[in-house]
Amino acid sequence: MAFSASDVLVLIPARLAASRLPGKPLADVGGRPMIVEVARRAVAAGIGRVAVATDAVEIADAVRAAGFEAVMTRADHPSGSDRIFEALGVLDPDGAVQVVVNVQGDLPTIAPETIRAALVPLEEGPADIATLTAVITEEGERTDPNVVKVVGTPIGENRLRALYFTRATAPTGEGPLYHHIGLYAYRRAALERFVSLPPSPLEKRERLEQLRALEAGMRIDVAVVDAVPLGVDTPEHLERARALLASNDN
């Protein structure tokens, strides 16, 4: 079942505190604050209403000054998922929205079609949550614990059903490994259930929030896309993002 734009709310959680890159959402990329560039790309995806969810007035002001929507949330949320759930209640108290797409605010080069791809598993199957992955092509990523791997079983062309997420090199044996992309589309009821659950044992062990859903028996389907968008976590990443945007003429 295809979703209409009124069925979908795209939320971009953002906060100023960042240990490796303070003030990251407001860092200039291509002449815009990073959070504005992400919002611009989310709007270009054309899948539904877009808003930035933040606890920082400075971020909200920058987003609104650029013509996009922002909603203020509490400062004490333990995760972006909790922040977007609060924002959902503020923006859609009547429950009209069926799907919430969580786009990280540090992906200034993400392609709009990549955001759109996250909806497809929910449109075509019974999954509670959908997310994205790409085949690992760089040898070093196979053993890098900062690269989260999706362990999944194929359920169609460019589609996996997630069985596990791990920082380890898995699965073993011949075949591709998959680099998880932390963009999620939740059915509304799934997001509500997810944030109501306590952190799970494997979630705490791997430090991967999505394992809470799997341990609770929720189904996560994964769309395979061509490439992993650049996440900006360090000054070096920021310079690379600026170079990529400049080379693409923004």
Swiss-Prot record:
One of its GO terms (molecular function) is 3-deoxy-manno-octulosonate cytidylyltransferase activity. It is found in: Cytoplasm. It catalyses: 3-deoxy-alpha-D-manno-oct-2-ulosonate + CTP = CMP-3-deoxy-beta-D-manno-octulosonate + diphosphate. One of its GO terms (biological process) is CMP-keto-3-deoxy-D-manno-octulosonic acid biosynthetic process. It is an enzyme of class 2 (transferase). Keywords: Cytoplasm, Lipopolysaccharide biosynthesis, Nucleotidyltransferase, Transferase. This is 3-deoxy-manno-octulosonate cytidylyltransferase. The gene is kdsB.
